[in-house]
Curated annotation (Swiss-Prot):
Full protein name: Uncharacterized protein AF_1408
Highest taxon listed in the record's lineage: Archaea
Organism of derivation: Archaeoglobus fulgidus (strain ATCC 49558 / DSM 4304 / JCM 9628 / NBRC 100126 / VC-16)
Length: 144
């Protein structure tokens, strides 16, 4: 297992500070933290990992929007580096790991095999497309 990847993360001081001090999405600001960034200098590729600690955990709409924007801005042109998308990993307390594939299925993986496969195949597992009507709802600041 890669050091630290399967450990549960508690809310760190930056997360607490963001929640207390930054404007809300209703005021036009959407913030998300990135759980992990995996870089391979040798292959010049990188990807993001969103960690969830329960198979019932959902990706909220603001997270999906940010991941979609990462894909739009980073996949196309980064000179010699290649962006391999954002993956969602479900890391459970017992150490088992699942990832969310392009069919929205949670697939159990061995983390080392998962990373090797991703690096060898330059695989982007999820594109985070969002329907237009959902985007309009996200930016509608009126209370429902």
């Amino acid at each position: 297992m890669l050091p630290g990847l399967a450990m549960s993360l508690s809310m760190d001081s930056f997360s607490v500070w963001m929640r207390k001090n930054l404007k809300s999405a209703y005021e036009g600001l959407v913030t998300q933290d990135i759980d992990f960034v995996f870089l391979s200098k040798k292959k010049k590729v990188f990807f993001f990992v969103e960690e969830k600690n329960s198979l019932n955990a959902k990706l909220r709409l603001p997270q999906r929007v940010i991941f979609m924007l990462f894909n739009e801005f980073l996949i196309n042109d980064l000179s010699e580096w290649k962006f391999l998308g954002t993956d969602v990993l479900y890391v459970l307390e017992d150490g088992t790991v699942y990832f969310l594939n392009d069919k929205n299925e949670k697939v159990r993986v061995n983390i080392e095999d998962y990373i090797v496969y991703k690096l060898e195949n330059y695989k982007i597992f999820k594109d985070f497309q969002i329907e237009e009507y959902m985007l309009k709802m996200l930016w509608d600041c009126r209370k429902n």
